[in-house]
Amino acid sequence: MRIVFLGSGAFGLPTLEWLVAHHEVVAVVSQPDKPAGRGKVLTPTPIAARAAELGLPVAKPADVNEEGMRAAVRGHRADAWVVIAFGQKLSRELLDGVFAVNLHGSLLPAYRGAAPIQRAVMDGCAETGVSVISLAERMDAGLVYATASRPIGARETSDDVHDQLALLGPGVIGEVLARHAAGTLVGEVQDESRATRARKLSKAEATIDLSAVSAAVARARINGLNSWPGCTVRIGDVSVKLLRVEECGEACGEECGATGDAPLLEADGVVRAAVGAIRVLEVQPVGGKAMTIGEFLNGRPRLVGCAVRPIAPEGA
């Protein structure tokens, strides 16, 4: 099949690779290059960069719905368009008469919106998955053609879940394209009574007071926000982003110390919460690199026994 691929984020990389191997990708459309890093160097999206490596024609429009770009994309006369983490809304005029499907990072109708993977982790869900849907006027409300699910591990962060869900993409996209080619594709209408929203993340959500939340809530929020914005705390006099934690039970929490209202960091990374305790596994000092809690404390043994206090991230 002739495929137009519209995507920007790394979530679509496994599916793009699979499509190149099994179909004819006639064009890739991605977001424009953006400044990145300390040097603010113009950098292509992960999809645009990989497409260029594969020798695929790449367009990077500021607005894919602009008349000239619309004509160019439609001019490929593809059999199907595959849309994954593209970042622009596709107009009715662009999609008119086109078979287009979208890979979404949740089991729809749950978690429609911008941050489905992070919200599933933050809500403490036991499982999540991906859905292949038709494109509709309302966000993520199209017909569901296929789904695939997987459990969310107790230590998994939203980054972990993102990467694992991305690997489910080729299977479900391949299934849908095959059924479309055979004329047997049927979609299921979403149950609006079960629809939930996955609103965009904000820096304000990254402030966490471990003395005021349970270990379960702390684990879910910290692991869900690990990539951005990250839950930052002050341990002694050092500001640290908590990247990965696990629950270690109420009994564990009873053995942990506290000073005033603030819990203390134990040598094994355990910190008491309002109910139970968490064990910090990975951290990133502000301005530094990510490391295990062991590596962090080996270089800063004075922080063992120090209070862990909430701080608001910059710009919150």
Label each residue range with its predicted role:
Residues L13, V41-P44, E66-R70, A114:
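Structural motif corresponding to alpha-helix initiation and N-cap regions
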Residues S8-F11, A62-N65, F86-K89, C248:
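Short beta->alpha connector loops
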Residues M1-G39:
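N-terminal Rossmann-like dinucleotide-binding module
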Residues R199-V213:
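Acyl-group handling in specialized metabolite and lipid biosynthesis
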Residues A80-R197, A204:
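Donor/substrate-binding cores of folate-linked one-carbon enzymes
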Residues R2, V26-A27, P57-H76, W81, ...:
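Internal alpha/beta domain cores that form substrate/cofactor-binding pockets in large enzymes
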Residues S211-A316:
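An anion-binding loop in the catalytic cleft
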Residues K34-L54:
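N-terminal beta-loop-helix "entrance" segment that forms/cooperates
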